[in-house]
Design a protein with these regions (language model features):
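Bacterial N-terminal signal peptides that target proteins for export
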Residues: 1-11
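Sec/Tat signal peptide C-region and signal peptidase I cleavage site
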Residues: 17-23
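Periplasmic/extracellular electron-transfer cofactor-ligation site
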Residues: 25-85, 93-103, 129-133
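Charged catalytic carboxylate motif
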Residues: 29, 90, 119-122
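Thiol/disulfide oxidoreductase modules built on the thioredoxin-like
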Residues: 103, 108-114
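Short, exposed beta-strand-loop hairpins at the edges of beta-sheets
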Residues: 112-130
């Protein structure tokens, strides 16, 4: 019984630490790391849709909701219809492995994901600084 209690406590601590690490990304590093995303996504004033939608204000935005982007996959549209929102945790999962979330997404086919949790946290921290336009 004691082993299970210790395991449970360790699991809670690990979850708390991972959430803290996610929230504490470095925006400067994130801006540099976003170059990988910039092949398909733009941010900032005048951002356009390229291979993927522009990402202004993406944190907190409903999935598949950029009006002038027409290449959403069926899976992404379904998420949007279900009210799925791009919060930090969902963005982290998506950037880590798009194919695991939505196999039919163009991003899942073209981008393998970023395995490094710190780099993902940095990108998300940077995206949080970009307001909707």
């Amino acid at each position: 019984m004691r082993t299970f209690q210790l395991f449970g406590l360790a699991a809670v601590a690990l979850f708390a630490l991972s959430a803290t690490a996610l929230a504490q990304g470095d925006t400067t590093k994130g801006k540099a790391a976003f170059a990988k995303c910039g092949l398909c996504h733009q941010v900032g004033p005048g951002a356009k849709t390229l291979g993927g939608p522009e990402l202004n204000g993406v944190v907190g935005r409903k999935a598949a909701s950029v009006a002038n982007y027409s290449m959403y996959s069926a899976g992404m549209k379904k998420l949007g219809e279900q009210g799925f929102v791009w919060d930090e945790q969902n963005l982290d999962k998506w950037i880590a492995d798009p194919k695991a979330m939505i196999p039919d997404s163009p991003m899942a086919l073209a981008f393998p994901g970023i395995p490094d949790a710190g780099e993902r946290a940095d990108i998300i921290a940077y995206l949080k600084t970009i307001p909707a336009q």
